Amino acid sequence: MSARKRIVVGVAGGIAAYKACTVVRQLTEAGHSVRVVPTESALRFVGAATFEALSGNPVHTGVFTDVHEVQHVRIGQQADLVVIAPATADLLARAVAGRADDLLTATLLTARCPVLFAPAMHTEMWLHPATVDNVATLRRRGAVVLEPASGRLTGADSGPGRLPEAEEITTLAQLLLERADALPYDMAGVKALVTAGGTREPLDPVRFIGNRSSGKQGYAVARVLAQRGADVTLIAGNTAGLIDPAGVEMVHIGSATQLRDAVSKHAPDANVLVMAAAVADFRPAHVAAAKIKKGASEPSSIDLVRNDDVLAGAVRARADGQLPNMRAIVGFAAETGDANGDVLFHARAKLERKGCDLLVVNAVGENRAFEVDHNDGWLLSADGTESALEHGSKTLMATRIVDSIAAFLKSQDG
């Protein structure tokens, strides 16, 4: 975790303002000093006393409050990060125009730190050309603007415009503090296909052969790609409990065969393929139609057949000209050492065998790789370059992976 930082949470006046309470609480519990700056409209949804209780700091709303302390300048100057959640269409427009007609917009003008906007508004507002232009302008100036989530909105409306989940906002806030700068918007125009989670190969209607992959690392990669401008499709295997990344097209699958078919369908349009899913190498040759019962008829062995190698298949398809748009293929390897060699020995062999451009390597062990929120490993390149991925959150590791993908694409452009 980053050292204690000073974070300003700006709250604009939308129905999602109540969700800012969770953002404030999570950032405060992470050890940061949080100052809440709501607009007057926001206080119609959540009272100042609530924000003061959650943050432990006084709440100021007006430019003319405590004038002798020059709050309209001081709050922004002292901030290490500004988070606007929710950011309404009106707030985005005023930020682009450089307005300073309340304490929040004045704070934005004086801040010299990363700024993160988490939009929330009706679908029509989000898709309006004015808002689209405003978001593009803010991103061009260096701000990070999340894509809103899709789902139920105010009243009976449904569609893109929901405030991203608090966990997504606070995770990205933490990442920005760790990086101490804004995320680049360097994947704009890139179509990325990401796989995540683990496949399950059924034995009968109840049982299956599976693995321990939670999907957290693949979800983090998809989320960072989207935040940096990519058009992302995420193929997720058995990832119940994970929050779908905002602004990402989701495809849910169960088995390795289903994952293969989904990749085959979406890969022709993709420029980047990130195979973070843990795909079963084998599946039962026969699937029982009914639950296998204990007793005389229970099997003494299970015959297995090999699943198609999805990663190697994508590499072959590109070489055969079937994926003309594909510029980068990234594989993942969860390895253990054995009598024949250590983790990197097996990873290098896999990179050569698969033929992908980059390979992310994780050493499997207790509290490592699977079912945890932090990770480490190595990144191997087909040109022989190897770099360590230092221990950190899976979001931070995803950022380093996307950094490497961006650098690889740039190297292709000459």
Curated annotation (Swiss-Prot):
Q: Which Pfam families match?
A: DFP, Flavoprotein
Q: Quote the InterPro entries the UniProt record gives.
A: CoaB-like_sf (IPR035929), CoaBC (IPR005252), DNA/pantothenate-metab_flavo_C (IPR007085), Flavin_trans-like (IPR036551), Flavoprotein (IPR003382)
What does its activity-regulation comment describe? Answer: Two related chemical scaffolds that potently inhibit the activity of the CoaB moiety of CoaBC through a cryptic allosteric site that sits in the dimer interface region of the CoaB enzyme were identified.
Q: Which GO terms describe its biological process?
A: coenzyme A biosynthetic process; pantothenate catabolic process
Q: In which pathway does it act?
A: Cofactor biosynthesis; coenzyme A biosynthesis; CoA from (R)-pantothenate: step 2/5; Cofactor biosynthesis; coenzyme A biosynthesis; CoA from (R)-pantothenate: step 3/5
Q: A GO CC term?
A: phosphopantothenoylcysteine decarboxylase complex
Region Phosphopantothenate--cysteine ligase, as annotated, extends over 192-414
For this chain, one GO molecular function annotation is: metal ion binding
Cofactor requirement: Mg(2+); FMN
What EC number(s) does this enzyme carry? 4.1.1.36, 6.3.2.5
Q: Which residues bind CTP?
A: M275, A276, A277, D281, K291, K293, K294, D308, D309, V310, L311, F332, K350, K354
Q: Where is this region: Phosphopantothenoylcysteine decarboxylase?
A: 1-191
PANTHER family for the chain = HOMO-OLIGOMERIC FLAVIN CONTAINING CYS DECARBOXYLASE FAMILY, PHOSPHOPANTOTHENOYLCYSTEINE DECARBOXYLASE
Family, similarity comment:
In the N-terminal section; belongs to the HFCD (homo-oligomeric flavin containing Cys decarboxylase) superfamily. In the C-terminal section; belongs to the PPC synthetase family.
Subunit-structure text: Homododecamer.
Name of protein: Coenzyme A biosynthesis bifunctional protein CoaBC
